[in-house]
From Swiss-Prot:
Main location: plastid
Binding-site residues for ADP, renumbered to this chain: G100, R408, K413, K462, Q493
Free-text function comment from the UniProt entry: Required for the synthesis of amylose in endosperm.
Subcellular location: Plastid, Chloroplast; Plastid, Amyloplast
GO molecular function annotations of the record: ADP binding; alpha-1,4-glucan glucosyltransferase (UDP-glucose donor) activity; IgE binding
One Gene Ontology biological process: starch biosynthetic process
Protein name, UniProt field: Granule-bound starch synthase 1, chloroplastic/amyloplastic
Gene that specifies this protein: WAXY
Key words of the record: Allergen, Amyloplast, Chloroplast, Disulfide bond, Glycosyltransferase, Plastid, Starch biosynthesis, Transferase, Transit peptide
Region (Disordered) residue spans: 29-67
Disulphide bridges, residue numbers: C337-C529
Length: 609
């Protein structure tokens, strides 16, 4: 599958934006927004409903036992309560991750488990994970005209059953850093057998709840059974609902099971040659769900199959990772990547992501010079700025505003737009720190800015986690000039550390950053990744100049406190996910408790050498 970027689908027409929407009414930090079809008589294609986070009624609430000092908040699960939820995805942090998908499958499941649900996450075994054990359970999976044997590895962490599908197509391809080799040998290059690999994942995931006898949790025993909700994530799991309906339900298996499909990035859809459909071993009934025609010649010209399209059409509920991104997806071809009409048909619900507040905690962060909370942030951030300036080789002066950019160096994140705005910013008394890795052309571009403006710009084009933490703590403003951003994590991390964001007005950035309260909005940027629009450069430069003028004022200090006083954890999003999944009506499902997540005691993932 070759990546389909929004630049390939950009049109000359204006996109879907928030021209005068600096503080949109849909901005509910822990709310969710559902878009459902109206009847034809309704006129508009969609109707919009906004619902705030709901709390369980007293009858629904179950007891939570507060544990010892070592375990400050331990959930006690009630046997038979809640739901059986099975997440399936190609990534699962911290074991495997290239972006937001891995973060969601790493962070959301523990939060749902804390609410009393039995939760499993299924992902490929890309490496020799030392904390995952061989269950000795195997399954025979039919792929094309042959059968492949998969094994199931397992570990139980933070209240969640983590299941890894073991097969040579996953394990033998990934050497070095797992995140760099999940989908192909190099960035932008896919493995030719990705259809086979992820077909294996989908079919093995359907076997796991029935055959894995898991007894790690004292309140949940045995297999998950058949009354489960499968939560599929992105194109790699698109065929799962079809396999469920084709291979299981006609035989009386999983009769009550339901499937939710979550879109993390519409730009990657799993488009393959139409002639490959028989290799999926699905009946003709499902061919139309995969059938897709576009005007591009990758991976082949003309008619194709589209895994994400099938995932959307065959699911019982479609979701995405922020309310505003849901609006963008149905707004037209440019932002819906040719599936906008399908999503207008099915409806789509947006729920904002949370973040790992234990890993990113300025009151305990070992990588920063001065630890702090909302009450001590102003002085502590000044000390951290001085440490950051020294680390970056910039003049140490806490009075100089410091802007930071952290992100993957690819078109979506706008590093080229950021670089183009730097010359205009050099007119100001300002320092800029750039951190990221990715496409070589962008790495060279950022380094050229450092060479052109020594003493004012520093570019680090390598992975450096300690520096990322110090930047969050020491920067005055975090620049997020994304062309599109389904949800975004970087702005959440910045606000967690009291760093207001200057961001593009797209996707989850609209739902999480409030103009004048927690950050600054640049407006909508072009989704055309092939060019840097001069108007976009002006928007980025003007917004950052506006932010620079606020730094050091009482208004800025208030913004810092506003950022830090938010609950950015997964607790609110998990409750919204619970409400949506309960609506699917799987037999035996019940609302969860008001619990707290079990925090990890140590680093979870250690791969073998």
């Amino acid at each position: 599958m070759s990546a389909l970027t929004t630049s390939q689908l950009a049109t000359s027409a204006t996109g879907f934006g928030i021209a005068d929407r600096s503080a949109p009414s849909s901005l509910l930090r822990h709310g969710f927004q559902g878009l459902k079809p109206r009847s034809p008589a309704g006129g508009d294609a969609t109707s919009l409903s906004v619902t705030t986070s709901a709390r369980a009624t007293p009858k629904q609430q179950r007891s939570v036992q507060r544990g010892s000092r070592r375990f400050p908040s331990v959930v006690v699960y009630a046997t038979g309560a809640g739901m059986n939820v099975v997440f399936v995805g190609a990534e699962m942090a911290p074991w495997s991750k290239t972006g937001g998908l891995g973060d969601v499958l790493g962070g959301l499941p523990p939060a749902m488990a804390a609410n009393g649900h039995r939760v499993m996450v299924i992902s490929p075994r890309y490496d020799q994970y030392k904390d995952a054990w061989d269950t000795s359970v195997v399954a025979e999976i039919k792929v094309a005209d042959r059968y492949e044997r998969v094994r199931f590895f397992h570990c139980y962490k933070r209240g969640v059953d983590r299941v890894f599908i073991d097969h040579p197509s996953f394990l033998e391809k990934v050497w070095g850093k797992t995140g760099e080799k999940i989908y192909g040998p190099d960035t932008g290059v896919d493995y030719k057998d990705n259809q086979m690999r992820f077909s294996l994942l989908c079919q093995a995931a359907l076997e796991a709840p029935r055959i894995l006898n898991l007894n790690n949790n004292p309140y949940f025993k045995g297999t998950y059974g058949e009354d489960v909700v499968f939560v599929c994530n992105d194109w790699h799991t698109g065929p799962l609902a079809s396999y469920l309906k084709n291979n299981y339900q006609p035989n009386g298996i999983y009769r009550n099971a339901k499937v939710a499909f979550c879109i993390h990035n519409i730009s990657y859809q799993g488009r393959f040659a139409f002639e490959d459909y028989p290799e999926l071993n699905l009946s003709e009934r499902f061919r139309s769900s995969f059938d897709f025609i576009d005007g591009y010649d990758t991976p082949v010209e003309g008619r194709k199959i589209n895994w994400m399209k099938a995932g959307i059409l065959e699911a019982d509920r479609v979701l995405t990772v922020s309310p505003y991104y849901a609006e963008e997806l149905i707004s037209g071809i440019a932002r819906g990547c040719e599936l906008d009409n399908i999503m207008r048909l099915t409806g789509i619900t947006g729920i904002v992501n949370g973040m790992d507040v234990s890993e990113w905690d300025p009151s305990k962060d070992k990588y920063i010079t001065a630890k702090y909370d909302a009450t001590t942030a102003i002085e502590a951030k000044a000390l951290n700025k001085e440490a950051l300036q020294a680390e970056a080789g910039l003049p140490v002066d806490r009075k100089i505003p410091l802007i930071a950019f952290i992100g993957r160096l690819e078109e979506q994140k706008g590093p080229d737009v950021m670089a183009a705005a730097i010359p205009e910013l050099m007119q100001e008394d300002v320092q800029i720190v750039l951190l990221g890795t990715g496409k070589k052309k962008f790495e060279k571009l950022l380094k050229s800015m450092e060479e052109k403006y020594p003493g004012k710009v520093r570019a680090v084009v390598k992975f450096n986690a300690p520096l990322a933490h110090l930047i969050m703590a020491g920067a005055d403003v975090l620049a997020v000039p994304s062309r599109f951003e389904p949800c975004g994590l970087i702005q959440l991390q910045g606000m967690r550390y009291g760093t207001p964001c200057a961001c593009a007005s797209t996707g989850g950035l609209v739902d999480t950053v409030i103009e004048g309260k927690t950050g600054f909005h640049m407006g909508r940027l072009s989704v055309d990744c092939k060019v840097v629009e001069p108007s976009d450069v002006k928007k980025v430069a003007a917004t950052l100049k506006r932010a620079i003028k606020v730094v050091g004022t009482p208004a800025y200090e208030e913004m810092v406190r506003n950022c830090m006083n938010q609950d950015l954890s997964w607790k609110g999003p998990a409750k919204n996910w619970e409400n949506v999944l309960l609506g699917l009506g799987v037999a035996g499902s019940a609302p969860g408790i008001e619990g707290d997540e079990i925090a990890p005691l140590a680093k979870e993932n250690v791969a073998a050498p």
